[in-house]
Amino acid sequence: MKTLGEFIIEKQAEYPEAKGELSGILASIRLAAKIIHREINRAGLSQDILGFAGSENVQGETQMKLDIFANETMKKALLAREDVAGFASEEDDNFIAFDSERNRNAKYILMTDPLDGSSNIDVNVSVGTIFSIYKRISPIGSPVTIEDFLQEGRKQVAAGYVTYGSSTMLVYTTGNGVNGFTYDPSLGLFILSHPDMKMPAEGKYYSINEGQYVTFPLGVKKFIKYCQENDEASKRPYSSRYIGSLVSDFHRNLLKGGIYIYPTSTVYPQGKLRLLYEGNPMAFLAEQADGMATDGFQPILDIKPTELHQRVPFFIGSKTMVKQANTFMQTFTE
């Protein structure tokens, strides 16, 4: 049995020039995940953390009380160790430059969706936390700048998510494969349960909100019909599975094989998911697990961000299925 802490130390030992900052950040995320896990597990017993907060985030989306709690928990956990120079979140209007001397001398910045799928909390459906870590490009010792956050996804040094469901799991990559750790509440430890995770090249599930079908571009409509057609050779029709939480849908497809799609639409002309907080970290994980992630035309990780809350159409999952979806997008243009 190997714990997350032991795994981090073991991997750090493989890089003697490393000073442990990245390990410290992962330890902060581990702590935040435990705290968020605790609050989610008692959500049905406490009205203090259930329901709407009465505020909106920068995208105009109504914030849940747990959105704000998870966001503040991540900030506090990172500030306590001073291994991060700056922080950006889906829930905040602007990035935050941590301004202690040690923070200014830190090499990394972190971006997060602190509680993905939070609208599901009140009905006891699984949710998640997503995180993404980059090396800063501004001078060490100075406050971070917007350019530190607007880096292509390929420059990520680590990314991962925590899924809070029937069990709580932390899944992450540092660019050398994907590993999953299951939380044992009796021990208070994350235990390595899914080493070297690989996404099946082909899958049998497609995940998309078909209730918005009429708003989708033609290529997506054609691909949905393709998924529903009978074809013994390709083992179609595929099964539709859509939870409404990116982390939950991706996690199932990572284990079982499948594709998750959140395309452009007449309601969301640029797509709905955020490139920096959702797209890039999940795309990094997918590629490290032999999967694929695109906007229907190009790899997500190759997109140069232009703003903190930039939206992007999103196709992610088993490589064969994403390639098929890309073909439909590129063939059936409007």
From Swiss-Prot:
Family the UniProt entry places it in: Belongs to the FBPase class 1 family.
Pfam families, alphabetized: FBPase (PF00316), FBPase_C (PF18913)
Binding-site residues, Mg(2+) 1: E90, D113, L115
Listed EC numbers: 3.1.3.11
Highest taxon above the source species: Bacteria
Record's subcellular location: Cytoplasm
Biological process, per Gene Ontology: fructose 1,6-bisphosphate metabolic process; fructose 6-phosphate metabolic process; fructose metabolic process; gluconeogenesis; sucrose biosynthetic process
Location (main, coarse): cytoplasm
InterPro entries with a match to the protein in the record: FBPase_C_dom, FBPase_class-1, FBPase_N, FBPtase, Fructose_bisphosphatase_AS
Necessary cofactors: Mg(2+)
GO CC field: cytosol
Catalysed reaction equations from the record: beta-D-fructose 1,6-bisphosphate + H2O = beta-D-fructose 6-phosphate + phosphate
Protein name: Fructose-1,6-bisphosphatase class 1
Residues engaged in binding substrate: D116, G117, S118, S119, N209, Y242, K272
Subunit (UniProt): Homotetramer.
Chain positions recorded as Mg(2+) 2 binding sites: D113, D116, E278
Co-factor note (free text): Binds 2 magnesium ions per subunit.
EC class name: hydrolase
Pathway(s) per entry: Carbohydrate biosynthesis; gluconeogenesis
Keywords assigned: Carbohydrate metabolism, Cytoplasm, Hydrolase, Magnesium, Metal-binding
Organism whose genome encodes this protein: Haemophilus ducreyi (strain 35000HP / ATCC 700724)
GO MF annotation terms: fructose 1,6-bisphosphate 1-phosphatase activity; magnesium ion binding
Name of encoding gene: fbp
